[in-house]
């Protein structure tokens, strides 16, 4: 089978290897689509935490179960998506429903082979069935949509609240769709790339601004009716975190969703204290897979425009380049794994 391998930082190669064999309790999945996440790009550049080389990347995927080993045989032939988090299931964090904090955590696409391949093994317990007829292309966005829903819920967004988002990449745009599902209003998007601002505007956002320091603050000072109750920070840049803190209303909430391990910067924490803000981090899909599947399969959430650039695995160099440069209106590069 074909697989994309990250051998070392900034070294991605297409390889041929034997089909993997599922271990007890695992399933073998024939993959259909996998989208390229910002964390994949950081991993490719060598600036990601808790990852190992060499490894097959990819964790936003869809596919079909073709074999199981000691798991539910009824899964064979079923279209599925799955959680990248492979945790012990018994530690304190796992018992509290926080598997991303597990001390024995393994993650598909980072510490064990992921979905940029024709086939992949995965614990059967990580799989989620797709309703018949669900688009496998759209379904590769179930995992990031679940991440967005989990973040919006951790920030406790309620109907009628105003929300601003910094960063209009894939997760930022999905956050906007998740806010809408919770009845919130996205009043502003801060994003430096013009084509991505256009993508945000197409979602019906009240206003978009560039991502330079001070842009969002200037907007809400000029238009106080846009000042958000909540700011969701999806870019991972320290300057954007500071911008969120200054732009949100007094007594408001700031959600930290994006992060970049290579970025450091100064902060002015007095704004947090003086404005009595709540900062809330969010990582992973939590328990939102089922809801994300329902929203995509029913058409309540449309991700077609988000999936902007399709590639075969053979064209992986261009897929990564376009995504890294955020060129040509790229919001999500994705691989068609059945071409």
Curated annotation (Swiss-Prot):
Which cofactors go with this protein?
Zn(2+)
Pfam families on file? ADH_N (PF08240), ADH_zinc_N (PF00107)
Q: What note does UniProt attach to the cofactor annotation?
A: Binds 2 Zn(2+) ions per subunit.
- Keywords of the record: Metal-binding, NAD, NADP, Oxidoreductase, Zinc
Cysteine disulfide links = none
Sequence positions that bind Zn(2+) 2: 88, 91, 94, 102
Q: Which reaction does it catalyse?
A: 2-deoxy-scyllo-inosamine + NADP(+) = 3-amino-2,3-dideoxy-scyllo-inosose + NADPH + H(+); 2-deoxy-scyllo-inosamine + NAD(+) = 3-amino-2,3-dideoxy-scyllo-inosose + NADH + H(+)
Q: What does this protein do?
A: Catalyzes the oxidation of 2-deoxy-scyllo-inosamine (DOIA) with NAD(+) or NADP(+), forming 3-amino-2,3-dideoxy-scyllo-inosose (amino-DOI).
Family from the record: Belongs to the zinc-containing alcohol dehydrogenase family. DOIA dehydrogenase subfamily.
Protein name according to UniProt:
2-deoxy-scyllo-inosamine dehydrogenase
> What organism does this protein naturally occur in?
Streptomyces lividus
